[in-house]
Swiss-Prot record:
PANTHER family listed in its UniProt record: 3-DEHYDROQUINATE SYNTHASE
Gene that this sequence comes from: aroB
Pathway named in the protein's UniProt entry: Metabolic intermediate biosynthesis; chorismate biosynthesis; chorismate from D-erythrose 4-phosphate and phosphoenolpyruvate: step 2/7
GO process terms (BP): amino acid biosynthetic process; aromatic amino acid family biosynthetic process; chorismate biosynthetic process
InterPro entries in UniProt: Dehydroquinate_synthase, DHQ_synth_AroB, DHQ_synth_fam, DHQS/DOIS_N, DHQS_C
Annotated GO CC locations: cytoplasm
Catalytically driven reaction(s): 7-phospho-2-dehydro-3-deoxy-D-arabino-heptonate = 3-dehydroquinate + phosphate
Entry's EC annotation: 4.2.3.4
Name of protein: 3-dehydroquinate synthase
Length: 357
């Protein structure tokens, strides 16, 4: 596997570094900044799993650690404020740095703090879940939730580097592994059908090198899309396949019911059903999607939670992808994707949605 992918950004170019030696790669990334202060942002789960790693960080660097509770509740302005307090108390300057080490929540949270503290300080991402490695860490999106609305406050603020190590995945629970596969299937279904087919046939237990290749292929796809449309005006919108409904599910349901990748899987199924109903996607493609989700134990319906189509539709109206009058869905097609604009007052669509859930 190649060791580095270089991402071109209108904000700031950065490298994605693949390694089995996180400490050495981080030291190489820091360069002369080794002498500066570092704040490592992580969550309790990662901190306890890799406490010896954090102890090594403390020995080698002028390092501080901020440990968040696990889960999406940490993507909040209250947590941002707590991290600001620590940065101020330790007298962090614009030349000091944040290092996030955790899943998507930690990366989004730490990146948002980095983007806003002193109007921007450098940061490095070390994603530890499959989902964060192939999706949320790539592309510079950072942000937090606000009043129950997913990723309502945020920015595009690329890191100095992203360090990818599949060794972290050895401690990842199967449910979280499947959530990462969900995002890989998303990009494969829209942009890279050979990747989708490889994921359909992949045997995790016997093919570690195969997993590394699939991760690299997924990241390469997202890199290509982000470089062409960093600010989500066209092509990058395709990566929201499944996300209009998925984000609404996350807003209305407790995290225990549906994790991010699971909510997105349900969203993809509904988007694909809409596409089939409009003659945009062959029924066989929908069936293939359902089969691979079943193989990875990803949900395809809302049976775990009592959520109505009406309540989902109300949340749709606050989605950041929307135009002034329309709710935007991303529908897969036989050759790519298209957008579907639903009027915010179209209550007949609520009935249609209810029939698809």
């Amino acid at each position: 596997m190649p060791q580095t992918l270089h991402v071109h950004s209108r904000v700031k170019d950065y490298d994605i570094l693949f390694t089995d030696h996180v400490l050495k790669t981080l030291a190489d990334c820091l360069g002369e900044r080794k002498q500066r202060k570092l704040l490592f942002i992580t969550d309790q789960t990662v901190y306890h799993l890799y406490q010896t790693l954090f102890e090594e960080f403390a020995q080698q660097y002028n390092a501080f650690v901020h440990v968040c509770p696990p889960g999406g509740q940490s993507k909040s302005l209250e947590r941002v404020s707590a991290i600001y307090d620590q940065l101020i108390a330790e007298n962090f300057s614009k030349k000091d740095m944040i290092v996030t080490i955790g899943g998507g929540v930690v990366g989004d949270l730490g990146g948002f703090v980095a983007a806003t503290y002193y109007r921007g300080i450098p940061y490095i991402q070390i994603p530890t879940t499959l989902l964060s490695q192939v999706d949320s860490s790539i592309g510079g999106k950072v942000g937090v939730h606000f009043k129950g609305l997913t990723n309502m406050i945020g920015s595009i603020y690329p890191p100095e580097a992203i360090i990818i190590s599949t060794t972290f995945l050895e401690t990842l629970p199967q449910r979280e592994f499947s959530c990462g596969i969900s995002e890989m299937l998303k990009i494969g279904f829209i942009h890279d059908r050979p990747l989708f087919q490889q994921l359909r046939d992949f045997q995790k237990e016997t093919d570690k090198q195969g997993l590394e290749r699939l991760i690299y292929q997924s990241i390469s796809n997202k890199k290509r899309i982000v470089e062409q449309d960093e600010f989500e005006n066209g092509l990058r919108m395709s990566l929201n396949f499944g996300h209009t409904l998925g984000h609404a599910i996350e807003s209305l349901c407790h995290h225990d019911f549906y994790h991010h990748g699971e909510a997105i899987a349900i969203g993809m199924v509904v988007d694909a059903k809409l596409a089939v109903s409009k003659g945009l996607l062959p029924k066989e493609d929908l069936d293939s999607l359902l089969q691979v989700f079943e193989r990875y134990q990803l949900p395809t319906t809302l049976e775990r939670a009592d959520v109505s189509a009406t309540s989902l539709f109300d949340v749709f109206k606050t989605d950041k992808k929307n135009s002034e009058q329309h709710i935007i869905f991303i529908l897969p097609t036989e050759t790519g994707f298209t957008t579907l604009a639903i009027n915010k007052d179209d209550h007949q669509f609520v009935e249609k949605l209810d029939s698809l859930l």
